Amino acid sequence: MTLRPVFIFDLDGTLVDSVYEHVLAWQEALDAEGIELSVWRIHRKIGMSGGLFTNQLLRETKVDITEDRVERLRHLHAKAYQRLSGKIRPLPGARELLQSLTNASIPWAIATSGRMETAAHNLAVLGVDV
């Protein structure tokens, strides 16, 4: 049996320079809900799944995070992120790396803890079909 290499890449902060747009979008969403949390605390949570993010948010702010509020926050984040996403670019060499792997018939995939409503733009910036 021959082992073949396979690559799985994270999207935000690995292939595209989008971390700060996520941070600013979450800050805007939290501000709209009256939840105070400093930017550096939000930055520490980027990459967490939605459930873990909201659990950490509850722990740090002592604010009740209901299902309705989670949905509002997600919607507000996505809306702010879409507005900020025009500045997002692939990180240097990311497109070329994916193309080189494709040309060499080496399978690769992209993973993200984000939702498609924000990830779709980043994938398009990379030239990846969804």
Task: Write out the residue ranges for each language-model feature.
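Conserved H-loop
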Residues: 36, 64, 128-130
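An amphipathic alpha-helix signature
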Residues: 23, 27, 50-55, 116, ...
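Short, acidic loop-to-helix structural element flanking the phosphoryl-transfer center
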Residues: 3, 83-110, 116-120
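Generic non-transmembrane alpha-helical segments
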Residues: 25-33, 73-83
